[in-house]
Amino acid sequence: YTGTGKTEILHALKRKGAQVIDLEGLANHRGSAFGGIDLPEQPTTEQFENKLFSEIQNLDTTQPIWVEDESKSIGKVSIPNAFYLKMGTMPVYFLEVPFAERVQHLVHTYANLNQQKLGEAIGKIAKRLGNDKAKLALEALEDKNYDKVVTLTLFYYDKYYLKGLKKRAESTILNFEIPTV
């Protein structure tokens, strides 16, 4: 799910010596409509692919390599098809963190970002979120009620994430319930 601290876990694994590819880091994007806010400009898809290839060259491909399960596109860049297809065959460690914990983590991550761009991001997902919920989220943003903004938008992202997960073979999904981010 969104807001479970997946990126932080990847960074912790890397500090412990695990082989990690941070696709969002390479893409300069957090992987959602809100993902590019206050980050450097994204590379071109070609630059992204070159950076990814360079990372892979420095790893032992006979050993596990940890990556975050992403959609084919991260912002405006696309994961190379062969890499994306390989990701789809690998086990998924699905992190279940209490909703309230995820809300707090996302508030901490996003509340200090550019407010206008946060509003624009809500606008980008308004149709999928539902115009009424989008309007409520924009009003909450204006009131700086970030818990409400995150709560409203998480329902969309949870549904989206589960839809993607259903495309995976059930035998490749390992659930982990953790109490906090």
Locate each region found by the language model.
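Conserved NTP phosphate-binding and transfer environment spanning the P-loop NTPase/kinase superfamily
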Residues: 85-92, 96-181
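Conserved nucleotide-sensing/catalytic segment adjacent to the nucleotide-binding pocket
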Residues: 15-86
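Short phosphate-engaging motifs
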Residues: 5, 74, 102
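Glycine-rich phosphate-binding P-loop
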Residues: 1-15
